Amino acid sequence: MNQRLIIKTALSAAILASLAGCASQPAHEWNADTTYKLTVLHTNDHHGRFWQNKHGEYGMAARKTLIDDLRDEIQAEGGSVLLLSGGDINTGVPESDLQDAEPDFKGMSKIGYDAMALGNHEFDNPLDVLFKQQDWANFPMLSANIYDKKTGKRLFQPYAMFNKQGIKIAVIGLTTEDTAKLGNPEFIGQVDFRDPKVEAKELIAELKKTENPDLIFAVTHMGHYENGNRGINAPGDVALARYLNEGDLDMIVGGHSQEPVCMEGPNVIKKNFKPGDECQPDQQNGTYIVQAHEWGKYVGRADYEFRNGELSMVSYDLIPVNLKKKINVDGQSQRVFVQDEITQDKAMLDFLRPFQEKGQSQLNVKIAESNGKLEGDRDVVRFQQTNLGRLIATAHMERAKADFAVMNSGGVRDSIEAGDITYKDVLTVQPFGNMVSYVDMSGQEVLDYLNIVATKPVDSGAYAQFAGISMRIENDKVTNVFIGNKQLRLDGRYRFTVPSYNASGGDGYPKIDTHPGYVNTGFTDAEVLKDYLESHSPIDVNEYAPSGEVMYQTNNVVNQ
């Protein structure tokens, strides 16, 4: 028999076998007219919080107890559980950061996560660290839209399949394409972050042909934006659901925007959600969208019923993990649990404690003190000039002997409370390990730069904090610029500092690290801040309070 006949015969046999299989195999493994219970538990934006905070809130030991109890309860009632994470395990507290989030990924494995989305902060470290973290995790880290620029192939597993009582569930992973500007440019030069909406549509079509799932979920790190109003951010979960065919995704388990996704009505988010409140998830184009705030503060619980191929949500809840509220008792403020205290799992505590002790041994030494709060809260520092933003910029300016300083608010990760300041406080505020850099430019170049950087919108990490400069921003244009109390001269020469991350184009800033006047000092931002605090202690926070140096005017309304 010649080769062509062998191939033809083999193909004919394969086609007949395939047709016979289609005729004899059931289309599904579940039983008709039977109601199945399925619960999806989820967290997101963990950011290194493996240990409880100083008030005894959240932490992975309490989370494990809660999830173990929920699993036992659900399985006792005949249901099944899927545990998912919306990503950003990395970057947040020094005890985790100094150990490459080893306690966090290994802790997630012990809790029993089924899958997670890769978040943008997974790319704050070199790729070899991320690959090491994959080895620590006994669950898949998913992203369908991240490719190797050289090979054109996906860098990570795009989806995972799960079988729950005969129900075939495909879980696809998607990562914000903003990672290209939010990730450290030094580590992602060969990584291509493609449009997750397009990748999702193509992958869903492929899965329907190859895997024939009963349900398709997406675990994403793209952000939830009310009614899809995303500003300068890349498209998020709402845009994803609307882009796909209706009902292509049964559920999106999200992250990135770090909020409880609880709706008051269609396309209207509940603005003042408090722990213990009822939570109604978003629903767009036949897709449920959920997100559980941040740091393991909550475990989201979505209870479904599956019957004859149809999925319906029975209930949804955000369960607080030992969150507390302040009350007044006999004229004094006390913190009490919002709900019953969740006992910390002893085995998990024993596992995590050595990591916590190792980290703390390096961090809890006092380096300075202050007479008030240095403001770095996300919902403040991304909207207005603050004393902490100005202090950090001043520290950079002093180290580089610069005329003024630019500091992206996304690099200010927390506040520093009044009183003693430790190295841990510094690393919590600046965990990324960016270098302080500076550039010498002409006045015209400076003005061109400011017209891009100083006009970045609020509510984004690109919003800039400044020191050593005053200006007015109106209609996306910078005017009345003074540097060192002298008006900007277009033919003058000026030096300013900027984090190396932004100098490389991060946050959409102009890429200036190839400018002939650019210098990377080699000093990490946290080290510079630590040295500045030590040498200027005690810190008078009032000296750094903004007093109208940077004025924004929009629709005749002036903001600082």
Swiss-Prot record:
Site (Transition state stabilizer): H121, D124
Enzyme class: hydrolase
InterPro entries from the UniProt entry: 5'-Nucleotdase_C, 5'-Nucleotdase_C_sf, 5'-Nucleotdase_CS, 5_nucleotidase/apyrase, Calcineurin-like_PHP_ApaH, Metallo-depent_PP-like
Cofactor note: Chloride.
Molecular function terms from GO: 5'-nucleotidase activity; metal ion binding; nucleotide binding; UDP-sugar diphosphatase activity
Positions that bind a divalent metal cation 2: D88, N120, H221, H256
EC number: 3.1.3.5
Keywords: Cell outer membrane, Hydrolase, Lipoprotein, Magnesium, Membrane, Metal-binding, Nucleotide-binding, Palmitate, Signal
Compartments reported by the entry: Cell outer membrane
Gene3D superfamilies recorded: 3.60.21.10, 5'-Nucleotidase, C-terminal domain
Positions contributing to a divalent metal cation 1 binding: D45, H47, D88, Q258
Signal sequence range: 1-21
Source organism, top-level taxon: Bacteria
S-diacylglycerol cysteine lipid sites: C22
Keyword Metal-binding (UniProt): yes
Binding site for substrate: F432, Y501, N502, A503, S504, G505, G506, D507
UniProt KW Membrane keyword: yes
Any one biological process term the GO annotation gives: nucleotide catabolic process
Membrane topology classification: Lipid-anchor
Classification via PROSITE patterns: 5_NUCLEOTIDASE_1, 5_NUCLEOTIDASE_2, PROKAR_LIPOPROTEIN
Cofactor(s) annotated in UniProt: chloride; Mg(2+)
Catalytic activity: a ribonucleoside 5'-phosphate + H2O = a ribonucleoside + phosphate
UniProt cross-references to SUPFAM superfamilies, sorted A to Z: 5'-nucleotidase (syn. UDP-sugar hydrolase), C-terminal domain, Metallo-dependent phosphatases
Function as written in the Swiss-Prot or TrEMBL entry: Degradation of extracellular 5'-nucleotides for nutritional needs.
Family under the similarity heading: Belongs to the 5'-nucleotidase family.
Name the UniProt record assigns to this protein: 5'-nucleotidase
Species name: Vibrio parahaemolyticus serotype O3:K6 (strain RIMD 2210633)
